[in-house]
């Protein structure tokens, strides 16, 4: 059998659709997955969370995989009798809804909430064990009110601020993007080439937490995927070195540069500033102004990725000024060059071409001097064009001559400190989180701009600042927020002086919404605070978080930052939000990501109609380790259907042939051993998140039970009933519909997924014998049944005593005997 046909599977084993409808109705009525807040409830608490979906349409294959995996984990803890919080909500602000509203002339809420209801119905059909009483939507005023409340608390603490600066601008979506939302120079949402613009924007000061974000990763080691931790470490980008002050001729204040190689300071032969920085504009001499302006215009068309590419020919312009090297007094030219970025370090660098390839490429292009100050034993970079950044002995460096790098760095920092021209410093690649957006469908920033009072927070009692009713063409991007055109909404009285003022017309990055939603689930209907701190202390932090690796830097980093701020505010008792993280792979098709352009998309609804929910879920989880991609062209939902029918028949026949309550100890011992070993192995595999291995063990038990029914003690044997019950319990993690039906057929009430897990009998886990393979010249000649505790000496003796083995070694010289007790003996002969 390969598919669901009409109302029944083609084998006629059970009516898949009727069974799904029956149990959906039962779960909706009984709500078996609602978490208890009863303080007297003795059950251990467990918080399992899937990254909440964006309502862009119905659920797709990626949702199906992620939520199937998360549901296995949640159902396992439900089955173990724990008090599990497994909630659902929607990340419902964002550009897709706004773009749809512009295209079809309606309000974004119409599209958003219609899609939410579609997805909610699909979640119910897909049998996810959710606590529906805690459902939330981030686009509800009752939710985004607290985004605004947090913004004001951040503002009070100096963590929310506004500044002028160069920002990433998406010309298609007409809004700014955080650095994390620019992927290889393009908008991560629409793929448009990103531009750089000078704008006044709101930021969250995540850089204040850079070191703590790094240090606290120790809590996550071994519990988060190492690649996610590596990605975050690289994004934060801690560098140790020195801040060095260069005097600029004609400028009173020195310019500070950060370098990780202060030991090479004697090799600095020119000075480079970012062409789009205010410093470059200031330093440009009048006679170079025209050339500089032309160059700056040229650079403005390049993305940061292009500017830092090692493949591009270096470009730049001399600014007509000179800097003074603080260690040797040398006069070095000041250039503007696109490979230096305004927002890294101080927007300026000392160029040491002998030991940095980008500096060397630039020096060779513009005939600037190259001075070797570290003897690495390699050829002169000025001749080869290959810089030598490695270790060596300092030369041409005055008091540093003869020192190694590790000796020279602290010495030069000491010299700079004594002279007042430098100091040890730490720099981070991480930049503050740009949180303002020039779009409508998001949380309004709760600030009022008063010509007399400046930036004035909206009073807490006036929150939420609700979005005005704009729709269709009024939402079209114009380079400023659509809210700016809502004059009745914009024009207000200043809360401080009462004079005329204007609301801030930007909305918040929707990653603000998802940076704390997991806390709101603990008390989703609370209207006096963002969350009940006592309940958060009981439920948090989240024990298991499940979602895609694409969120490694954005959502996960921001959530970690938010949690640390809330910890400092005394609102949560933990500093990390997610104890364990599982990143599932992608569902691809024919070796490629699914896309309309490739025509390789797979419709989840059609797959469910064809095979049934249980088969689709089982296939998703059985395809391989959860972190690996699933190629839907390579898996077989039809095979899952066949297996589920075999499991169903075992449960049905055991239920029909035997009565509950009979002591299974009176049943077939071999099957009982298999049943309890399966329990132990499934438990171990699920806890290790090797879900495909757990399913394989269940399949083996179904086969053993089938064999016992057909050619063993028969379906009436108590051991068969015990096996059938364990099949129902363990299969309930992966295929809840057929498992619930089997559990009920076997005479049980209540959900198979709640409090039913069994502990294996240790006595039945002890193997009385194992099979030992005996090889002669690497060919199998006999198989022996031996004790699992047999010694190597005894096993060798038994192997040599075997008549079959004797027939193959008679008259031959035995070179050596390899024993791997208790399962292998290999006799090597001449």
Curated annotation (Swiss-Prot):
GO cellular component assignments: cytosol
Origin: domain of life: Bacteria
Subcellular location: Cytoplasm
Enzyme Commission designation: 6.1.1.4
Binding site for ATP: 596
Motif ('HIGH' region): 53-63
Chain segments carrying region Disordered: 379-399
Molecular function terms, GO-annotated: aminoacyl-tRNA deacylase activity; ATP binding; leucine-tRNA ligase activity
Pfam family, one: tRNA-synt_1
Keyword terms: Aminoacyl-tRNA synthetase, ATP-binding, Cytoplasm, Ligase, Nucleotide-binding, Protein biosynthesis
Record carries keyword Cell membrane: no
Single GO BP term: leucyl-tRNA aminoacylation
Motif 'KMSKS' region: positions: 593-597
Catalytic activity field: tRNA(Leu) + L-leucine + ATP = L-leucyl-tRNA(Leu) + AMP + diphosphate
Alphabetized InterPro entries for the sequence: aa-tRNA-synth_I_CS (IPR001412), aa-tRNA-synth_Ia (IPR002300), Leu-tRNA-ligase (IPR002302), Leu_tRNA-synth_edit (IPR025709), M/V/L/I-tRNA-synth_anticd-bd (IPR013155), Methionyl/Leucyl_tRNA_Synth (IPR015413), Rossmann-like_a/b/a_fold (IPR014729), tRNAsynth_Ia_anticodon-bd (IPR009080)
Main location: cytoplasm
NCBIfam families membership: leuS_bact
Family: Belongs to the class-I aminoacyl-tRNA synthetase family.
Protein name (Swiss-Prot/TrEMBL): Leucine--tRNA ligase
Originating species: Thermobifida fusca (strain YX)
């Amino acid at each position: 059998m390969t598919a669901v046909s009409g109302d029944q599977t083609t084998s006629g084993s059970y009516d898949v659709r009727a069974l799904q409808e029956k149990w959906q109705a039962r779960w909706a009525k009984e709500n078996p997955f609602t978490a208890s807040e009863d303080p007297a409830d003795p059950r251990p608490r467990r918080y399992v969370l899937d990254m909440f979906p964006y309502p862009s349409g119905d659920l797709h294959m990626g949702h199906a995989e992620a939520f199937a995996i998360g549901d296995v984990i949640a159902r396992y803890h439900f089955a173990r009798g724990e008090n599990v919080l497994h909630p659902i909500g929607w990340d419902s602000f964002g550009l897709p809804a706004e773009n749809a509203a512009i295209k079809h002339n309606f309000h974004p809420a119409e599209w958003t909430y219609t899609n939410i209801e579609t997805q909610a119905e699909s979640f119910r059909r897909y049998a996810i064990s959710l606590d529906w009483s805690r459902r939330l939507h981030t686009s509800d005023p009752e939710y985004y009110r607290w985004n605004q409340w947090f913004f004001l608390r951040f503002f009070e603490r100096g963590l929310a601020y506004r500044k002028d600066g160069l920002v990433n601008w998406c010309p298609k979506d007409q809004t700014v993007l955080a650095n994390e939302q620019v992927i290889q120079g393009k908008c991560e949402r629409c793929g448009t080439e990103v531009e750089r613009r000078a704008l006044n924007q709101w930021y969250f000061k995540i850089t204040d937490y850079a070191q703590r974000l790094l240090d606290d990763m120790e809590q996550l080691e071994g519990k988060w995927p190492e690649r996610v931790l590596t990605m975050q470490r690289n994004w934060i980008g801690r560098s140790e070195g020195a801040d060095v002050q260069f005097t600029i001729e004609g400028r009173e204040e020195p310019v500070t540069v950060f370098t990780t190689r202060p030991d090479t300071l004697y090799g600095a032969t020119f000075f480079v500033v970012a062409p789009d920085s205010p410093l470059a504009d200031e330093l440009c001499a009048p006679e170079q102004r025209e050339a500089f302006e032309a160059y700056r215009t040229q650079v403005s068309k390049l993305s940061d990725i292009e500017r830092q590419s090692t493949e591009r020919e270096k470009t730049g312009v001399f600014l007509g000024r000179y800097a003074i090297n603080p260690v040797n007094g040398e006069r070095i030219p000041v250039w503007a060059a696109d490979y230096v970025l305004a927002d890294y370090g101080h927007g300026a660098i000392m160029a040491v071409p002998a030991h940095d390839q980008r500096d060397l490429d630039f020096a060779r292009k513009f005939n600037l001097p190259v001075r070797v100050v570290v003897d690495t034993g390699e050829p002169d970079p000025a001749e080869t064009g290959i810089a030598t950044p490695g270790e060596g002995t300092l030369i041409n460096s005055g008091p540093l001559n003869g020192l190694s790098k590790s000796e020279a760095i602290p010495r030069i920092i000491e010299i700079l400190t004594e002279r007042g021209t430098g100091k040890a410093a730490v720099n981070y690649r991480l930049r503050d989180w740009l949180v303002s957006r020039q779009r409508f469908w998001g949380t309004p920033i709760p600030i009022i701009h008063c010509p007399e009072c400046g930036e004035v927070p909206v009073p807490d009692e006036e929150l939420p600042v609700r979005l005005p009713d704009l729709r269709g063409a009024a939402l079209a991007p114009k380079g400023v927020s659509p809210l700016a055109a809502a004059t009745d909404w914009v024009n207000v009285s200043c809360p401080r002086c009462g004079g005329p003022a204007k609301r801030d017309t930007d909305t918040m990055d929707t990653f603000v919404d998802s940076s704390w939603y997991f806390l709101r689930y603990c008390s989703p209907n609370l209207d006096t605070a963002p969350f009940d701190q006592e309940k958060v202390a009981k439920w948090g932090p989240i024990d298991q978080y499940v979602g895609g690796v694409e969120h490694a830097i954005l959502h996960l980093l921001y959530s970690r930052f938010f949690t640390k701020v809330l910890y400092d505010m005394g609102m949560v008792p933990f500093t990390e939000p997610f104890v364990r993280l599982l990143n599932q792979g992608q569902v691809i098709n024919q070796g490629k990501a699914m896309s309309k352009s490739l025509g390789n998309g797979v419709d989840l609804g059609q797959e469910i109609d064809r095979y049934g929910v249980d088969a689709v879920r089982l296939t998703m989880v059985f395809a391989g380790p959860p972190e690996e991609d699933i190629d839907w062209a390579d898996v077989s939902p039809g095979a899952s259907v066949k297996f589920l029918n075999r499991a169903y028949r075992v449960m049905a026949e055991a239920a029909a042939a035997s009565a509950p309550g009979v002591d299974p100890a009176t049943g077939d011992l071999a099957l009982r051993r298999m049943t309890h070993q399966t329990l132990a192995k499934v438990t171990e595999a699920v806890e290790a998140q090797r879900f495909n291995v757990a399913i394989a063990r269940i399949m083996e038990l179904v086969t053993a039970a089938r064999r016992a029914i057909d050619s063993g003690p028969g379906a009436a044997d108590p051991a068969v009933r015990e096996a059938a019950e364990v099949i129902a319990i363990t299969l309930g993690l992966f295929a809840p519909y057929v498992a619930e039906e089997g559990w009920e057929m076997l005479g049980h009430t209540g959900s198979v997924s709640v409090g039913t897990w069994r502990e294996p009998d240790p006595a039945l886990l002890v193997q009385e014998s194992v099979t030992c393979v005996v090889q002669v010249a690497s060919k199998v000649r006999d198989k022996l049944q031996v004790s699992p505790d047999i010694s190597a000496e005894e096993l060798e003796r038994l192997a040599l005593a075997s008549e079959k083995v004797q027939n193959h070694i008679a008259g031959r010289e035995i070179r050596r005997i390899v024993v791997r007790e208790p399962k292998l003996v290999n006799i090597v002969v001449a």
